[in-house]
């Protein structure tokens, strides 16, 4: 038997919560921000992942709600819904409840469209109502908005302490580009090209969470500006930023040597979420190591395409050829390295 799987999952969950605190604090959530990470944050992927993880920290969850109350207009709702569906990332009920809550404010009416897109058609029965925060009992009347979506939690009291994303750090680079280029795909395309210098439409579409046709149209429009060039290599047309260094005026933080890294966060978060769910299956600790390895191998098979999209599949020690203890040890080591 391998009862350490439970302890490993608890340790992994705490690392993920620390990571989420770090990322959300960099975006403006009240907390201790550490803004020296070299990558830009993907707010849609981060929010979706948080619906799955932040329910294990009620303070973090409510600080995210507070941030959305102030900054919800910076979330690309169409992209959020697409990533949720295509990457199977995040909790639908929690996402619908958040959207419902925000849509009751005049500044966030558009969130109602997201709520309708992700909510379940039928109302939850009493048997299908679940506690939002597993470790916190409900002592007073539950919040009616979350209860409507089958989630029981206490009343919500937002502190109003969240700030808008600061433009002088790598973490918020995508927000800076959205302020310059708008809330549609153009900002993501520019962010990706600045980080990677060149790419073709299919690759950029996979990395940014948009359809290829949309990306192709954006690239064609950007090319007309004279700042983006293209060249045909084989069957693919590759696009790049001309005079790349001239865009360094966007690097407005101290000691900025390079543009922030673009990480394809959504499939990476999906993979971590899947492994965490597998480790949390009831009774898994009490099963034989062979049974545990079979469960983990099934999870590995399931997320291998996502790991490939995230550019991590070749860094994995765990493979289908491993068995028993060897597979478990390799996969747990991989999970440690997947969390930045």
PLM regions: where:
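Short alpha-helical segments that sit at the start of domains
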Residues: 160-188
